[in-house]
């Protein structure tokens, strides 16, 4: 299987998924009615109330710890890659 065959298969798959999404979304749109005719658009029970930072739940603490770990890993990886590039360039130089 050549590279062109894989490219054509991926393109066909992407186009098929796009057509499927476009046709499924078109069935949910009601073009004849407006928002005011559907009733009250805003519901007080669905509005966001925010997250308390001072008294946060265990899940949010774990989420932020994971976020810090991911950011630290990305920074360490980028520093390591940059350090390797500079040292490789430095050892190529002839004195």
From Swiss-Prot:
Main location: virion
Signal sequence region: 1-26
Family annotation (InterPro entries): GN_domain, HSV_GN
Ranges that cross the membrane: 56-76
Function: Envelope glycoprotein necessary for proper maturation of gM and modulation of its membrane fusion activity. Also plays a critical role in virion morphogenesis.
Organism: Gallid herpesvirus 2 (strain Chicken/Md5/ATCC VR-987) (GaHV-2)
Compartment(s) of residence: Virion membrane; Host membrane; Host Golgi apparatus, Host trans-Golgi network
Virion surface compartment residues: 27-55
Family: Belongs to the herpesviridae glycoprotein N family.
Bilayer disposition of the protein: Single-pass type I membrane protein
Protein's name according to its UniProt entry: Envelope glycoprotein N
Subunit details: Interacts (via N-terminus) with gM (via N-terminus). The gM-gN heterodimer forms the gCII complex.
One GO term describing the cellular component: host cell Golgi apparatus
Residues exposed to the Intravirion side: 77-95
């Amino acid at each position: 299987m050549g590279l062109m065959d894989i490219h054509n298969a991926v393109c066909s798959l992407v186009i098929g998924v796009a057509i499927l999404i476009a046709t499924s979304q078109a069935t949910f749109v009601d073009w004849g009615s407006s928002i005011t005719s559907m009733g009250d658009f805003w519901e007080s029970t669905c509005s966001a109330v925010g997250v308390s930072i001072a008294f946060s739940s265990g899940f949010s603490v774990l989420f932020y710890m994971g976020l810090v770990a991911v950011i630290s890993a990305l920074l360490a990886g980028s520093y390591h890659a940059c350090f390797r590039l500079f040292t490789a360039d430095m050892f190529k130089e002839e004195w």
